């Protein structure tokens, strides 16, 4: 929501769409740093640190969006719409309007730019986590005690890792706002479940044999998740049944590894019986 609120206000006040996206990413990074500092420096438990930051951001987001509500005198707002004109009297343009000359349909612009951004972000992530600092962040995430024993500044790595993850979250919120041309204080509700489901789906189907494979599995897991949801809605499933579909999909995905293991075990048993005979 922070990324969406920031990009909405930047666009409303006539900033360049790409610069607005960058500012929202920086704001997300700072929010992640705050969470990391609460945990590493103030010794607040991990989960509680995130809850504290998230609670504070609820009010901060409303304060930020208050700058984009025309005629608003209260100083805060729960939503911002980008369908009108900016402060210079020009129709608000998002990054998805950039390639309008290449594609006649708006949906093609959205798909093209999103694919382009995904490829760029994946390339940056893959390169960064292959560096010494990136490897230190990964090591800290896997085994903090062992990383500390190897001389890694685990507190700094935790802060950096949270900053990067929150920067990516803010980026997704900013893109979501530009696609839908609106930002509201509840747009982030349920995103955590979707993220976890995407990871589970990706790992269950593609596995996580290497870091490259892990990144791609998470990415394609998210795509598969939304394809299944969209397909169900296209087939006429009522909108209020989405949560039930989410639950069923996650359950099925969690069962897949168990089924694979059972099949593999059964094959090995048969092979052993044949060799025994």
Feature annotation, model-predicted:
Residues 1-41, 66, 209-210, 234:
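Membrane-embedded helix boundary and interhelical linker motif in transport proteins
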Residues 1-6, 17-18, 38-52, 133-136, ...:
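Short, non-helical or kinked segments that cap or interrupt transmembrane helices
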Residues 16, 107-187, 192:
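Helix-loop-helix "hairpin" substructures at the membrane interface of multi-pass membrane proteins
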Residues 17-55, 116-119, 220-221, 225:
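Alpha-helical transmembrane segments within multi-pass membrane transporters and channels
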Residues 22, 169-244:
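Transmembrane alpha-helical segments in multi-pass inner-membrane proteins
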Residues 46, 50-53, 57-130, 160, ...:
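Transmembrane helix-bundle core of multi-pass membrane transporters
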Residues 47, 75-77, 110-115, 158, ...:
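Loop-to-transmembrane alpha-helix initiation sites
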Residues 80, 87, 142-149, 153-156, ...:
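Cytosolic-side transmembrane-helix boundaries in multi-pass membrane proteins
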């Amino acid at each position: 929501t922070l990324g969406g609120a920031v990009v909405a206000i930047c666009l409303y006040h006539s900033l360049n769409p790409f610069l607005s996206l960058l500012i929202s990413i920086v704001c997300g990074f700072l929010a992640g740093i705050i969470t990391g500092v609460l945990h590493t420096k103030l010794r607040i438990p991990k989960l509680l640190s995130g809850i504290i930051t998230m609670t504070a951001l609820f009010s901060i987001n409303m304060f930020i969006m208050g700058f984009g509500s025309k005629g608003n005198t209260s100083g805060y707002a729960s939503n911002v719409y980008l369908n009108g004109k900016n402060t210079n009297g020009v129709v608000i343009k998002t990054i998805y309007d950039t390639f309008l000359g290449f594609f006649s349909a708006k949906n093609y612009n959205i798909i093209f730019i999103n694919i382009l951004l995904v490829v760029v972000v994946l390339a940056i992530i893959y390169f960064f986590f292959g560096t010494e600092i990136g490897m230190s962040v990964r090591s800290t995430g896997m085994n903090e005690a062992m990383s500390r024993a190897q001389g890694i500044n685990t507190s700094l790595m935790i802060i950096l890792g949270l900053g990067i993850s929150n920067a990516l979250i803010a980026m997704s919120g900013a893109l979501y706002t530009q696609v839908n041309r609106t930002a509201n204080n509840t747009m982030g509700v349920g995103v955590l479940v979707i993220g976890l489901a995407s990871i589970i789906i990706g790992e269950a189907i593609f596995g996580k044999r290497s870091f490259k494979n892990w990144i791609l599995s998470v990415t394609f897991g998210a795509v598969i998740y939304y394809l299944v949801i969209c397909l169900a809605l296209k087939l006429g499933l009522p909108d209020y049944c989405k949560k039930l579909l989410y639950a069923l999909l996650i359950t099925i995905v969690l069962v897949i590894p168990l089924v694979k293991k059972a099949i593999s075990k059964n094959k090995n048993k048969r092979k052993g019986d044949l060799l025994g005979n």
